[in-house]
């Protein structure tokens, strides 16, 4: 079974997905990690600013690097790079690369391959997961929250000195980009269950989804 969890940045997708994977014994996959790894590849291996913005060169570069799913995370060329992709530098560029159609297709193909090769139960989270990547998922959830709440959440997650107002502006810009993408735009799809997480605890959100899961099993 696949439980697909969609929604904007800092709406609770990762926290809820990780908690659900523990509660239900499902494997966890974040598409956002893949986009962040691709952003890291672009930053590490491109030689000039032109190449950073050249989609076809980036596609070739991605094919030269080995990205593997491993134990609810991803490895780049055999190395765990999670600490390198959850940074401000990655934050500011990931939306650019995730807007490239061919890069989105690479990520979507990779996600489908993982599920096909490793036949198991999955919690998969990310933007457009419910509408483009796994529209056939048994359970489709869209998590949302006010921009103020999402800003505070992101602020509390970080260990740098970025101001609240800067974070809020960055989130609003990210929302605008995600909602207007040519391919895989952020939206509430057909048959997707909407949950506003603004004033709900992590356990409350998980309980709502687990109730839906139990109903779908019958």
Swiss-Prot record:
ATP binds at residues 7-15. GO terms for molecular function: ATP binding; CMP kinase activity; dCMP kinase activity. Keywords: ATP-binding, Cytoplasm, Kinase, Nucleotide-binding, Transferase. It is found in: Cytoplasm. It holds the Pfam family Cytidylate_kin. GO terms for cellular component: cytoplasm. Gene3D superfamilies: P-loop containing nucleotide triphosphate hydrolases. GO terms for biological process: pyrimidine nucleotide metabolic process. This is Cytidylate kinase. It comes from Borrelia duttonii (strain Ly).
């Amino acid at each position: 079974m696949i439980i697909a969890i969609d929604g904007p940045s800092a709406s609770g997708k990762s926290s809820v997905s990780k908690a659900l994977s523990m509660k239900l014994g499902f494997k966890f996959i974040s598409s956002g990690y893949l986009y962040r790894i691709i952003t890291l590849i672009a930053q590490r291996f491109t030689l000039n600013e032109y190449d950073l913005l050249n989609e076809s060169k980036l596609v070739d570069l991605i094919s030269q690097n080995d990205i593997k799913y491993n134990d609810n995370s991803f490895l780049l060329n055999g190395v765990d790079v999670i600490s390198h992709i959850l940074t401000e530098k990655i934050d500011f560029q990931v939306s650019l690369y995730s807007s490239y159609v061919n890069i989105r297709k690479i990520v979507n193909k990779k996600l489908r391959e993982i599920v096909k090769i490793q036949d198991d139960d999955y919690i998969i989270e990310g933007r457009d997961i419910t509408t483009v990547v796994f529209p056939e998922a048994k359970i489709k959830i869209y998590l949302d929250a006010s921009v103020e709440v999402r800003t505070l959440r992101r602020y509390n997650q970080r260990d740098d000195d970025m101001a609240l107002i800067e974070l809020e502006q960055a989130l609003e810009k990210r929302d605008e980009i995600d909602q207007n993408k040519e391919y895989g735009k952020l939206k509430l799809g057909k048959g997707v269950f909407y949950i506003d997480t603004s004033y709900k605890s992590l356990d409350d959100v998980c309980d709502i989804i687990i109730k839906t899961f139990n109903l779908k099993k019958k």
